[in-house]
Amino acid sequence: MVNWTRTNAADGDTGIKINVDNAGMTWAPEAYWDDSLGAYVVFFSSRMYTDDTRSTAVTSTNTGYAYNVLLYCITRDFKTFTEPVMWQDTNYSRIDSTVIKVGDYYYRFTKNEESGAAGSYITNGKSTFLERSKVLTATTEEASPDTDPETGWQLLDQRILPFEGPEAIKLTPETSIRMKQGMPWSSWLIPVDTSRT
């Protein structure tokens, strides 16, 4: 999928193309409001190809295999979007980011789609990891606990769970629970389908 399409559009509005022509898909889209931009950041997973025929995938300089990246666009009205920007390209396959904001930091859960390690710090394949940053649109070229979260995405944790499509939801005070000791989200929940883990 390269564009989102309405199939029930009686008004003739059948969709808006947001991805580039050489992208193989526009998977797991999510939008998050960015106060500093006064707009939504819409991010999604893609596999890039060498041209718009999408017959030859771009391959990783680390693994030699095709891999997935994440891009983002900015919108205020969900009718007009900026051109997509490469958000996460580490030369390792990653998909399905979800974002929450707690205090001044954005926290990003993403799945490592590699079968094994994805660099020096993400050591397990097919599992979700956690990063944080004060800048939602900061780009990522390497996962590292040494990245300054003031300007980039700092790796905090990995091997969280082996699932795709994580989602973080803010709970009401009456239903809040502590997800992980020492982490600042006592009122956040990550739903997990345990029937497949």
Where are these regions (language model features)?
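Carbohydrate-active catalytic/glycan-binding domains of CAZyme proteins
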Residues: 1-197
